[in-house]
Amino acid sequence: YKNRTEFIRRHVVFDNFAKFPQVQRYLETGVLENYRRQILVDMPVERHTVRVRRSIHVKHDEELYSRISKTRFDPWKDEPVQNAGGLCYLFRRVVNDDSRRYAAVLDVLKRHPRVVIFYNFDYELERLRGLEKDGFSVSEYNGRRHDPVPEGESWVYLVQYTSGAEGWNCTTSDTMVFYSLNYSYRVMEQAEGRIDRLNTPYSKLFYYRLVSNSPIDRAIQDAISRKKVFNERAFIGL
């Protein structure tokens, strides 16, 4: 393109009703994608690390899960479920907010002294905060707290996916626990990368996924294995 004006004239449509210049859509995006592929240079990075992924199977309250599935009723709020998102949230709470899942974390901490734990929901955070009472040094990275990566020989770093799947790095731990799975393969991959850095001293990195045999956990795992995003409405059948 000779100049910015030529590019805008050919590819950009502005919103005529906006109070300031606002792009409404782009034209001939296939041409732009072709230009992008031509100018990008592939720079493969040879990593010295190996990611060891292990699934830890934990049980859940199957009776409560089944009852919610049949009645579509929220036992915590004592009200009917309104939509697919609400029902999936309840399924996940039954599965994730279980003492046996917390016990699985304690087993991992017996083998690994410095652990990053990713979680989704506030009720998971509340349970994981119990690690402090169990004698562990606990720091957090979420929407309310941005504690730095802990220091010392033994610690736990509780990180919420939305806040901390990217934007920080850690080279003092070789272990990550996914207390619950994220819906997105991309987010899970970004989270794993927090400890997989070029300057990490570790050659083996351990990733533990806590999973149950519940239908929703199996469906989320399937979406992640296919590098997709889990779809709540498709899962519920709406």
Pin down the residues of each PLM region:
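Conserved helicase ATPase core of P-loop NTP-dependent helicases/translocases
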Residues: 116-118, 125-164
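A short beta-strand element within the Helicase C-terminal
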Residues: 168-181, 206-209
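A conserved SF2-helicase RecA2
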Residues: 183-238
